[in-house]
Amino acid sequence: MSKVTVFGTGSFGTALANVLAENGHQVLMWGKNETTINEINEQHINSKYLKTAELNEDIEATLDIETAVAFADIYLMALPTKAMREVAQTIDSLLSSKKTFIHVAKGIENDTYKRVSEMLEDSISPKHNAGIGVLSGPSHAEEVVIKQPTTVAASSKSESVRQLTQDLFMNDYLRVYTNEDLVGVELGGALKNIIAVASGVISGMGFGDNAKAALMTRGLAEISRLGEKLGANPITFLGLGGIGDLIVTCTSTHSRNYTLGYKLGEGKSLDTALNEMNMVVEGVYTTKSVYHLSKEVNVDMPITTALYKVLFENRPVDESVKDLMGRGKKAE
C-alpha cells in the first residue's frame, strides 16, 4: 500500500481521498480551511463540499504544508487551476527528493494558456519530479464518495505514472482506463467546462433538448478543432476524457459550471451568480483563457466566443444565441 498526500480539500479531492483510503492507502489531506480540516479529522465529513457523506475514518488532514509534503512520495493535486502554480512552487521549495504528481484540475491557466501538467512542469524542479499525470473523466464527486459506479481515464507521458494511477484508484466502483494522450485528456476536461456553462445558459433560458443536443455536438466539434491544433489525438475526445465528461457536465445539476450557466440564463449577472454559489467555477476562467488562445492559434470557436462575450463583455444571453444561430451557412 502507498502513502498519498492530497493537496486540496474540495469536493473531488475529498472524494478521491476517500477512494484511496478505502483501497487501503494511507492518506493525508492538506488545506487552508481550519473548519474543514477539523471536520475531516474529528467528524469524518466535509460539510462544505460533500454535505453529510461519511468519509473513511483513516483519512487525516493538516493545515501544515511541511507536514503534508513530508508525508508521502505521491501527491494528488486537487486544487483549482488558478491556485496550482503557487502551491506547486511552495511544495517544490520544501522538497529534497523526487515525487510523483497526479492532478485532477480541469482548466487552462490565464495569461500563459498552459495546461495543468505544463504548469506543474514549470513549477517542480526536474530533481524533484518523478512524473506528472492526470485523472479525468465523467466523475461527479457526489457520486464517487457514495461509491456509485464511475469510470475515468488516467493519462501521463510516463507509462509508469499511468499504471501507478490506475493501480492506486481502481476498485469495484471506480474503473480506471489508461490513455497515452495527455494533451487530449487534459484539454477535454478543461474545454468541456466552457460548453457546460453554455448548456446551463440555454436551460436557464428555457430552451429544450434540441438546443442542448446541438450545443453539445457543436461544442465537441470546436473542442476537437482546438485539441488537434494543440497536438491532441482527436479520438481522445470520443472517450471518457472528452464526450464522457462533456455529457455528465452538461446534463447534471451536480455540475457547478452548468449551475452557473443556468443562473446566467435566468438573467443574473456573473458576479451575482458566483456570489450565490460561493465556489470555484473553472469554466469561467477557462473561457477567458481559451477565447484568447483560439485567436492566437486561429481556431474557430463560436460557442466559446459567444460565452466569452456574455461573461466578460456583458452581452445579453439572448443576443448571444442570435449570434450563434445567425452565423453564415456552412457544411457540417
From Swiss-Prot:
<feature type="binding site">
    <location>
        <position position="106"/>
    </location>
    <ligand>
        <name>sn-glycerol 3-phosphate</name>
    </ligand>
</feature>
<dbReference type="InterPro" id="IPR036291">
    <property type="entry name" value="NAD(P)-bd_dom_sf"/>
</dbReference>
<feature type="binding site">
    <location>
        <position position="192"/>
    </location>
    <ligand>
        <name>sn-glycerol 3-phosphate</name>
    </ligand>
</feature>
<feature type="binding site">
    <location>
        <position position="245"/>
    </location>
    <ligand>
        <name>sn-glycerol 3-phosphate</name>
    </ligand>
</feature>
<feature type="binding site">
    <location>
        <position position="280"/>
    </location>
    <ligand>
        <name>NADPH</name>
    </ligand>
</feature>
<dbReference type="InterPro" id="IPR013328">
    <property type="entry name" value="6PGD_dom2"/>
</dbReference>
<dbReference type="InterPro" id="IPR011128">
    <property type="entry name" value="G3P_DH_NAD-dep_N"/>
</dbReference>
<dbReference type="GO" id="GO:0047952">
    <property type="term" value="F:glycerol-3-phosphate dehydrogenase [NAD(P)+] activity"/>
</dbReference>
<dbReference type="GO" id="GO:0008654">
    <property type="term" value="P:phospholipid biosynthetic process"/>
</dbReference>
<dbReference type="Pfam" id="PF07479">
    <property type="entry name" value="NAD_Gly3P_dh_C"/>
</dbReference>
<feature type="binding site">
    <location>
        <position position="256"/>
    </location>
    <ligand>
        <name>NADPH</name>
    </ligand>
</feature>
<feature type="binding site">
    <location>
        <position position="12"/>
    </location>
    <ligand>
        <name>NADPH</name>
    </ligand>
</feature>
<feature type="binding site">
    <location>
        <position position="137"/>
    </location>
    <ligand>
        <name>sn-glycerol 3-phosphate</name>
    </ligand>
</feature>
<dbReference type="Pfam" id="PF01210">
    <property type="entry name" value="NAD_Gly3P_dh_N"/>
</dbReference>
<comment type="pathway">
    <text>Membrane lipid metabolism; glycerophospholipid metabolism.</text>
</comment>
<dbReference type="GO" id="GO:0005829">
    <property type="term" value="C:cytosol"/>
</dbReference>
<comment type="function">
    <text>Catalyzes the reduction of the glycolytic intermediate dihydroxyacetone phosphate (DHAP) to sn-glycerol 3-phosphate (G3P), the key precursor for phospholipid synthesis.</text>
</comment>
<feature type="active site" description="Proton acceptor">
    <location>
        <position position="192"/>
    </location>
</feature>
<dbReference type="InterPro" id="IPR008927">
    <property type="entry name" value="6-PGluconate_DH-like_C_sf"/>
</dbReference>
<keyword id="KW-1208">Phospholipid metabolism</keyword>
<protein>
    <recommendedName>
        <fullName>Glycerol-3-phosphate dehydrogenase [NAD(P)+]</fullName>
        <ecNumber>1.1.1.94</ecNumber>
    </recommendedName>
</protein>
<keyword id="KW-0443">Lipid metabolism</keyword>
<dbReference type="InterPro" id="IPR006109">
    <property type="entry name" value="G3P_DH_NAD-dep_C"/>
</dbReference>
<feature type="binding site">
    <location>
        <position position="141"/>
    </location>
    <ligand>
        <name>NADPH</name>
    </ligand>
</feature>
<keyword id="KW-0444">Lipid biosynthesis</keyword>
<feature type="binding site">
    <location>
        <position position="32"/>
    </location>
    <ligand>
        <name>NADPH</name>
    </ligand>
</feature>
<feature type="binding site">
    <location>
        <position position="106"/>
    </location>
    <ligand>
        <name>NADPH</name>
    </ligand>
</feature>
<feature type="binding site">
    <location>
        <position position="256"/>
    </location>
    <ligand>
        <name>sn-glycerol 3-phosphate</name>
    </ligand>
</feature>
<keyword id="KW-0594">Phospholipid biosynthesis</keyword>
<keyword id="KW-0963">Cytoplasm</keyword>
<keyword id="KW-0547">Nucleotide-binding</keyword>
<keyword id="KW-0560">Oxidoreductase</keyword>
<feature type="binding site">
    <location>
        <position position="282"/>
    </location>
    <ligand>
        <name>NADPH</name>
    </ligand>
</feature>
<keyword id="KW-0521">NADP</keyword>
<feature type="binding site">
    <location>
        <position position="255"/>
    </location>
    <ligand>
        <name>sn-glycerol 3-phosphate</name>
    </ligand>
</feature>
<dbReference type="GO" id="GO:0005975">
    <property type="term" value="P:carbohydrate metabolic process"/>
</dbReference>
<keyword id="KW-0520">NAD</keyword>
<feature type="binding site">
    <location>
        <position position="257"/>
    </location>
    <ligand>
        <name>sn-glycerol 3-phosphate</name>
    </ligand>
</feature>
<dbReference type="GO" id="GO:0046168">
    <property type="term" value="P:glycerol-3-phosphate catabolic process"/>
</dbReference>
<dbReference type="InterPro" id="IPR006168">
    <property type="entry name" value="G3P_DH_NAD-dep"/>
</dbReference>
<feature type="binding site">
    <location>
        <position position="139"/>
    </location>
    <ligand>
        <name>sn-glycerol 3-phosphate</name>
    </ligand>
</feature>
<dbReference type="GO" id="GO:0046167">
    <property type="term" value="P:glycerol-3-phosphate biosynthetic process"/>
</dbReference>
